[in-house]
Amino acid sequence: MRHSKRTHCPDWDSRESWGHESYSGSHKRKRRSHSSTQENRHCKPHHQFKDSDCHYLEARCLNERDYRDRRYIDEYRNDYCEGYVPRHYHRDVESTYRIHCSKSSVRSRRSSPKRKRNRPCASHQSHSKSHRRKRSRSIEDDEEGHLICQSGDVLRARYEIVDTLGEGAFGKVVECIDHGMDGLHVAVKIVKNVGRYREAARSEIQVLEHLNSTDPNSVFRCVQMLEWFDHHGHVCIVFELLGLSTYDFIKENSFLPFQIDHIRQMAYQICQSINFLHHNKLTHTDLKPENILFVKSDYVVKYNSKMKRDERTLKNTDIKVVDFGSATYDDEHHSTLVSTRHYRAPEVILALGWSQPCDVWSIGCILIEYYLGFTVFQTHDSKEHLAMMERILGPIPAHMIQKTRKRKYFHHNQLDWDEHSSAGRYVRRRCKPLKEFMLCHDEEHEKLFDLVRRMLEYDPARRITLDEALQHPFFDLLKRK
């Protein structure tokens, strides 16, 4: 029987992954500290593109930003909205796994390209013994409950630790050699020896066991949990080792978007995977580019003469979906607030209740981000988020406004928003009607934007389902092969 009660973690309030620098307090970058007036200053308007120039690489100059603007976009993603308390600690546990579960990913976040094999697994090794909880001569925790370990340590007489892939409030993820499987490299999540984290870990394990047993060959591309075990009070979950997240690939490629044929292949796999969850009465609730990992993130480097720079092109677009720590069954309690801010559906913001359609909205946001190289909803304020939606998608339906208890966002059944305020000017600069984001207007781009528009339908009852999305004309080219 699965757990019906999930553990909250009030001390987790950041969207970031382990591998990223902490971003809180005085270090937060203010939302309007950058000027969007410099965007596209070197680029021609999209209407000047001829049909023959609709190739994705040629149109990408629309998304060229100076270094400061790109750094802003990256940092902005780490500014998780206030007030969101996830049901599980696992959101950033899986974030660590998802972002740093590959060798290429580990190398990318360090100043040196060489791997430091003798580096200890955690900075906690330097803590004095007075800050440790010692259970035996060889097993120690630090004061926060993290297992103290280093390269060469062996878990369960089988998993030899090679390196640390990431660390967070909940625990850490390490890369290991599985000596029980002829030296296979795996990712092992080591959960803190703290009660609420252990309970939440077991809840996630039950979701993973359900999904993996229903789809043992990973046809539907959910990450494979190979096994789990208890290591002196630490729940350890063993995962297959994957490549970079789709977000990290974009980031390491200077925020250049994916080619449209790659978007098609990735989108189809994502829709298949999440549709599998929906048919199993689950809602993922935290879909975003960080939670979509490439099986292998190998690429070729080509010089783009138009943009005068090297750019990376994927060799293989196969993906896996990760982070099931907040996945919710239909018959379980539904927290009022779910999803990462940029991918949060309007029914969640308006506290109207949510179910599987909130995942579809998130996928729509992901696809437009793959297409542009950046998220269109760059905000951490709910009313501003709604204003961005109205700027991009048109007015919020009256019946949703009438039903919401979030009256502070509205006045006379309209969004209470001053377009002439600094926030209003920011939204006006940053956002525009959805179709104006199109890089060109050939048939395949039109089909993609039609699919995205159906996914970003305000009313969840009218939003396209994933069964329907998989039959959308945007995917016709895949079915002909």
Curated annotation (Swiss-Prot):
Q: How is it modified after translation?
A: Autophosphorylates on all three types of residues.
Task: Report a single Gene Ontology molecular function.
Answer: protein serine/threonine kinase activity
Any one Pfam family match given in the protein's UniProt record, by short name: Pkinase
Q: Which PROSITE patterns match?
A: PROTEIN_KINASE_ATP, PROTEIN_KINASE_DOM, PROTEIN_KINASE_ST
**Could you say which EC number(s) this protein's record lists?**
2.7.12.1
Q: Does the keyword Disulfide bond apply?
A: no
* GO BP of this protein: regulation of RNA splicing
SMART domains named in the record: S_TKc (SM00220)
* Purpose of the protein: Dual specificity kinase acting on both serine/threonine and tyrosine-containing substrates. Phosphorylates serine- and arginine-rich (SR) proteins of the spliceosomal complex and may be a constituent of a network of regulatory mechanisms that enable SR proteins to control RNA splicing. Phosphorylates SRSF1 and SRSF3. Required for the regulation of alternative splicing of MAPT/TAU. Regulates the alternative splicing of tissue factor (F3) pre-mRNA in endothelial cells.
Q: This chain belongs to which protein, by name? A: Dual specificity protein kinase CLK4
